Structures are given as C-alpha cells and as structure tokens.
Amino acid sequence: MKKLGKLLLGLISLVATIAAAFLVWIQCSWDRDHDAHPTPQLKASTDPAVIKQGEYVVRALAHCGDCHSPKGSEGQASDAAPQMVGGRVFDVPVFGKFISPNITPEHATGVGAWTDEELARVLRTGVSRDGHMRPFMATIAPMADEDLVAVISYLRTLPGARGATVDDQPTLIGKFVIKGMEPDRRAAPPYVPAGGVSVERGRYLALGPANCAGCHSASSPQSGLLPEAPYLAGALEPMLDETDPSMEFAPPNLTPDKDTGHIYNWDEDGFVARFKAGRVYKGSHMPWESFGRMTEEDVRSIYRFLRALPPTHRELGPTRRPRGYAKPS
C-alpha cells in the first residue's frame, strides 16, 4: 500500500509539474512575433474618388464602425462622420475580453503614426504594427487592393481623436488559441468594381468586404477562426444577445436549401426590402445600420450570389431563441 501511495503521489506530482510548465509556456509565449510577415506595398491616395470609395467600404460594406465605435452599430445610425475611436468591449465567453482600437489618425492612441503599409498588413493579415496578432482582424475577409487602398485613404481623412488605450484581456484558453493563430495568408481576390448587378460582384462582397461568410459559416480554432466550408450554411455556435443575456442569436443558413435555407422563400425584392427595413432586435449582431447604406445594386448582387450557391441542409433552429437552445437532432 505504501508503494502504491508513493506511486500515486509521484504521478500527481508529475502531472502537476507538466501542467505548471504548460501554463508558464503559454503565459510566456502566447503573443508571438510575426513582424517578419510581408507587408503589402500599398499607399494611400488623395484622389477624391478613391476616398469616396473608401468611405463606402468603411461605412457600408465592411461595417468598420460596428466594432471600432464605442456604441457599435448604434453609433453609426446617423450620416455624421463616424467616431472610430475604438473602446468597444467584446466579452467572448471562455476566450476573454477584447477591446477594439482607435483607428483615427491620432498619433498617441490611434493610427496616425502607422505607415500605409502597416495599416494594409493588419487589414489583410491581422498582424499589427508591433508584429503581434490582432485576433479579430485576422478573421476579417480579404479585399482587393483597390478597396484596401481606398479604405486606408479614407481613414487618413478622419478627424484624429483620442481613444481607447486598454489592452485585450484573453483568458488562458484565449492565449492558447491566439498562440496557434497564423497571419491570414489568403490571396487578395480579384477586384469586381461596383456598377450593375451580378453574381460576380455579389461573390466578391459576400466573401470579401461585407464578410457575410464570417458570421454565416462555421468556424473553429482549428481553422484559425476563419470560415469553414460549406460557406454561408449558417454558424454552428450561437452569439449572445448583448442586450438580453437570456437570449442568443443563430446566424442562419443562407444557402438555397428548401428545408433549412433561411431566405429560400424570399424573392429579390423582399431581400432588398429587409436591408432597407433595418434593425428589429437591438441586440442583433447583424450590422443593419451599416448595411442599410449599401447600394441597391450591391444588395441585389449579394442575393443573386446566395441563390447561386449549392444548397446545404443544416438545421439551426430559430435565429433568436433562449440561451442554451437545444438544436434539432
């Protein structure tokens, strides 16, 4: 018995030592340096047409203010210049708290001291100026060089304002996930300019700047939190209703599956009307205020792309339901 007791104590001690070593390893190495990752050689433009294009991408398609405004989408409801000073807190269960940064050209707390190339890198790959990963930025969809230059050009015209200086607060699990993340190496997609209605423009928007696939597809730490195929078949994990913690939202299946496709029975005019109608639930994660600024041509293009997708059968249940809802088997 004494030998067995010593053996058990030895095993417990070994496990504790390994666990402690693992914790120290994560704490000391989670914030990896990716500064060697290539920086896109892109420069901002002062061309008014390019700046106007950037304003449309920032304020409508890419819904940047949904994260980089303290009030999220609510702060983007007016036509006034957006207050991109950051400070919005994203409390992600299990993974920690993440605070959006100031992206105005203010030097002390914003991106005024950043080069155009550094801005291009964080927007395209998620690698920040200091070489470290910005987890949320690493998951935004890639956009063509033309739109990326336009975004940077527009951001340079915003009034500089002091903003958030609080660091992210990832949990140990969050640090472990961030440690495993790699810079986004997806190639920039071919540019499909605005003008007219087409499936090609809809594909570019839904998988690019508008990032429909980012919320309406499954993702996991194994995929680097990037969308997993089949794209746009709905998210497997719900999102909490920030205004009512007893409720949650399930980003629905947008493929044309006749049984589980959320918009299967919608016609094109109905799809456009829904975007014009705006927010129904205050706590919805859908950036209705920003998407309400999209041109009708772009909304119709997205609809036509969604209708051209292969149907995927994925039953997700109600889009808004009590927290912890049991999915149909």
Model-derived features: where do they sit?
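N-terminal type II signal-anchor transmembrane helix
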Residues: 1-33
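Extended surface/linker regions that mediate inter-domain or inter-protein docking
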Residues: 13-16, 20-23, 138-203, 301-305
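C-terminal capping alpha-helices of c-type cytochrome domains
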Residues: 23, 115-129, 139-165, 267-281, ...
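Electrostatic cytochrome c docking/interface patches
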Residues: 35-59, 178-207, 260
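The canonical Cys-X-X-Cys-His
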Residues: 54, 61-71, 151, 202-205, ...
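Extracytoplasmic/periplasmic/luminal assembly and interaction segments
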Residues: 56-98
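Electron-transfer interface patches adjacent to heme c in soluble/periplasmic c-type cytochromes
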Residues: 84-118, 139-148, 230-274, 288-299
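Small-residue-rich helix-loop
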Residues: 221-224
